[in-house]
Amino acid sequence: MERLQRLGGAIGAAANYLAKSCPPGIPQQPTARLQLMDSQIQVLTMAVDIIHQPLQDFERSLSDEQRAKLNGATPVKRALSARRDNTVIHSCGASTAAIDWSIGQIEKSVQLNEQQRPALSDVQQAFGKAATDLEAHCPTSVPRSAVARLETIESRLDATWRAILSIQVALQDFEGKLTDDQKYRFQSMTFAAE
């Protein structure tokens, strides 16, 4: 019972931490949005860290039968898990078309000269590498245990954080090569989620 209470307290603490860390809004500028994503990934990672050890302690304290119930060993839960597995697999695919579209929009809006094009190419490569790295950390199925699911989330958050950092570096370098007018056009762009 004590371990369950510790887990409940950790979940409550993580929820409060997340609630206090919610941004008041989403910035318009691409680099500012990436900075916000960076900070939110760090917040999510901290929340997962708060829960991890109490969850692990709780799971270890259970009998095999209790652990099976916690991990969803009922026919209904297995069916839901199979449906979720299918969703996980489909939601992780990298979209080169979306990357190419975004790069095309930047090129059209900003109107680059020949000396600036390599920096945009670096941005495109950073997006492509980030997509590949995220794909490599995409789970092929939902792990059975609660701790394993949490560890999968931790791994995915870490991969997302590294992807954001690589894109930030490329975007900052790209922005540094733009004229003031081009920077204004770039910062004024909006990108709809594809």
Where are these regions (language model features)?
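Charge-rich (acidic/polar
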Residues: M1-E194
